[in-house]
């Protein structure tokens, strides 16, 4: 399992959690973004910079992803592609996207896009809470533990 990070919009606290997990579990973690992201020195953490453009980083993640890999993203259409390709998708707030929930999440996203297009002010997401940070760390740990057990 590799961990792919949609790093363009990934919160700093999430990246810090990922960096610690990569070194602790010795899991290859690759950040993909259209700008350089500072990463700590580690043999398990890499940065890939792609050209600017709509969904260029997302497309690169999907291209490189193999079944069983984990993608960290808040981008719901990207999460749907990851699941379709046999990967796992986790958002920075600790919500695991699955075959069972991705369609309803996509539908809600599309509904909110329609509302915004018609002039309704929907606001953005709230700042990440401590409980969401903890939920992410816990879910990441569960996924890594499960992978390590299957690998034995």
From Swiss-Prot:
NCBIfam families: PRK00124.1. This is UPF0178 protein swp_1285. PANTHER family: UPF0178 PROTEIN YAII (PTHR35146:SF1). InterPro entries: UPF0178 (IPR003791). Belongs to the UPF0178 family. Coiled coil: none annotated. Pfam families: DUF188.
């Amino acid at each position: 399992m590799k961990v792919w990070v949609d790093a363009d919009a990934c919160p700093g606290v999430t990246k810090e959690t990922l960096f610690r997990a990569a070194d602790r579990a010795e899991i290859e973690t690759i950040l993909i973004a259209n700008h350089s992201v500072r990463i700590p020195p580690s043999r398990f953490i890499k940065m890939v910079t792609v050209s600017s453009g709509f969904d260029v980083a997302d497309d690169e993640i999907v291209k490189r992803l193999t079944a069983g890999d984990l993608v960290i993203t808040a981008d719901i259409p990207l999460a749907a592609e990851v699941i379709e390709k046999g990967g796992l998708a986790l958002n920075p707030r600790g919500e695991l996207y699955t075959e069972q929930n991705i369609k309803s999440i996509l539908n809600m996203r599309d509904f909110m896009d329609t509302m915004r297009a018609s002039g309704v002010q929907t606001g953005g997401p709230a700042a990440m809470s401590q409980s969401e940070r903890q939920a992410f760390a816990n879910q990441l740990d569960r996924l890594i533990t499960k992978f390590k057990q299957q690998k034995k």
